[in-house]
Amino acid sequence: MTRTARAKSAPAVGPGRPRDTDLDTAIIHATRQRLAEQGYSQISLSEIAAAAGTTRPSLYRRWPTKLDLVVAALEWGFRAQTDSYPTEAISELEPREAFIEAIRRLDPAYFNADAMLLMGNFMGEARRTPELLDVVRERAVNPRLAQLEAVLLKLREDGRIRADTDVRTVATLCFGAYFATFLREDADHRAIAERVCDTLWPSMVADG
């Protein structure tokens, strides 16, 4: 069993009164806000409970540990980002537009403007609480990279990009562009996908 599998992303369910889903949502939102402001090590479950209008015992009945709660908050964000994608499938787009859209979905801040701060915090916690980075890799980073790689593989198979295109390296470069932009304090991260495509596409496109 992996560390991620041991981290519970779903609230505990037990006998008694029906669950208050509005309270669950309030707790998740309070957790996400404090993660961005304070980081994993510094967040207080008492403060989260107070911000959500509940108590620590009520919080613990839902998520037995801080890690369980934070994983649940991350899972909520991953689902929300996926739900926010355009309804048109990438496979229905023209080759260049499909490449751009897949790059766009790599953006950690696609849905959550504070995502880069969270990523930095989780990387800083890699030795103390490696489960956090495991969750991010398995539920967010790897699936999004796999989607871009699948787009590139299809384009390569169809002869739209060069047969010697290193799909994995291209995907890694695209993902890394978001971190470099954040660290350089470039203002418009929303334009990254187009700029990266403008740079890489001419060297990838198949002759003829």
From Swiss-Prot:
Expression induction: Negatively autoregulated. Transcription is induced by 4-nitrobenzoate.
Keyword set includes Transcription regulation: yes
Signal peptide range in chain numbering: none
Domain of life: Bacteria
Classification via PROSITE patterns: HTH_TETR_2
PANTHER family per UniProt: HTH-TYPE TRANSCRIPTIONAL REGULATOR RUTR, TETR-FAMILY TRANSCRIPTIONAL REGULATOR
Name recorded for this polypeptide: HTH-type transcriptional repressor PnbX
Species assigned in the record: Nocardioides sp. (strain LMS-CY)
Phylogenetic lineage: Bacteria, Bacillati, Actinomycetota, Actinomycetes, Propionibacteriales
Gene: pnbX
